Amino acid sequence: MKTLEYYEVIEYPVITEKTVNMISTTNRVTFVVNKASTKKAIKEAVEKLYAVKVKTVNVLFDRKNRKKAFVTLKKGFSAQDLANKLGII
């Protein structure tokens, strides 16, 4: 399998009422990512593209067969600032 570039790993942010609530309460942002991407690749892509530090990455496949990544940011980095940068909030 070939390695993916940073912009190929992250497809788009998920914008729902639940994910917007998670931004403010748990400092977590949700992305739909490439199915071939790993947690390590997702972490590197988020850190390089958005200039933040990632604490954890959790992934799941939803019913629409999309791979979602729940990215928790480290203390000192705000998910709300990242959401503003992405145009979510």
Regions found by a protein language model. Give the residues of each.
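Contiguous, often N-terminal, cationic amphipathic patches that form binding interfaces
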Residues: 1-89
